[in-house]
């Protein structure tokens, strides 16, 4: 009976596969949005103020950071939880693949969230004259919560490695 339960639990990892396929679809949508942003502002590039251009570039950076986060979660999650990718399938293997454990992934995700939040906060500061003070305050508080969480997770990870 135990063997059957263990096998069921082990094989249930494949339920994550459609999730990673869904993330791939999300990445495709994000890429489409990125190019939509470029196509939308290209005709206006010479008429727009520099501050608007900076906001558009910040939006593109935001999309790139989220895309990088998606790729990292898809690859490392697939390799850690479903199946190791074979070397013959991908000749140009990313150097971090196969080297990230769950804690490393969590720390990278937390760092990425802080970076994304920083870009979002910078965009809000650039539009401060059009943004309510209350919204700015809450965005700063939420950003600080992300930063503290990232530091806390990194500290806990470091402490658990020194005890081992």
From Swiss-Prot:
Instruction: Name the NCBIfam families for this protein.
Output: HI0507
Give me the Gene Ontology terms describing cellular component.
plasma membrane
Spans traversing the lipid bilayer? 15-35, 53-73, 136-156
Organism field: Baumannia cicadellinicola subsp. Homalodisca coagulata
Q: Which domain of life is it from?
A: Bacteria
Q: Where in or outside the cell is it found?
A: Cell membrane
Q: Give the primary localization class.
A: membrane
Its membrane topology is listed as: Multi-pass membrane protein
Q: What is this protein called?
A: UPF0114 protein BCI_0033
Keywords on record: Cell membrane, Membrane, Transmembrane, Transmembrane helix
Keyword Acyltransferase (UniProt): no
Protein family (similarity comment): Belongs to the UPF0114 family.
Q: Does the keyword Transmembrane apply?
A: yes
């Amino acid at each position: 009976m135990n063997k059957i339960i263990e096998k069921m639990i082990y094989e249930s990892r494949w339920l994550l596969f459609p999730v990673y396929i869904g993330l791939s679809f999300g990445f495709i949508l994000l890429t489409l949005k990125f190019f939509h942003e470029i196509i939308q502002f290209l005709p206006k590039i010479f008429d727009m103020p520099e501050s608007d251009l900076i906001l558009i570039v910040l939006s593109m950076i935001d999309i790139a950071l989220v895309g990088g986060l998606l790729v990292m979660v898809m690859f490392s999650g697939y390799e850690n939880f479903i199946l190791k990718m074979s070397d013959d399938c991908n000749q140009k293997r990313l150097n971090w693949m196969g080297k990230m454990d769950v804690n490393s992934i969590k720390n990278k995700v937390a760092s990425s969230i802080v970076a994304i939040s920083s870009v979002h906060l910078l965009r809000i500061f650039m539009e401060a004259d059009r943004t309510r003070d209350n919204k700015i305050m809450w965005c700063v508080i939420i950003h600080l919560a992300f930063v503290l969480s990232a530091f806390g997770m990194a500290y806990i990870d470091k402490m658990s490695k020194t005890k081992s």
